[in-house]
């Protein structure tokens, strides 16, 4: 059964640009599915949403980020900080 929702003009404009011939319901559903699939910080978010990184670059960025995070944890323990 259809439901009526209210959205701001700027959100409407953004959804209109995203829908590309699909219904608003299909577009919103796709966004929700995408969010649910990627809400835990998946590198594919950048690939799918923005297309700014290829698979190799995304993997390298994830690896570098992990190394940086590990180095901060190591320093904190080494200096006696918690």
UniProtKB/Swiss-Prot annotation:
InterPro entries associated with the record: Put_antitoxin
Domain of life: Archaea
Matching Pfam families: VAPB_antitox
Keyword terms, alphabetized: Toxin-antitoxin system
Reported function: Possibly the antitoxin component of a type II toxin-antitoxin (TA) system.
Similarity comment: family membership: Belongs to the UPF0330 family.
Protein name: Putative antitoxin Saci_0468
The species this protein was found in: Sulfolobus acidocaldarius (strain ATCC 33909 / DSM 639 / JCM 8929 / NBRC 15157 / NCIMB 11770)
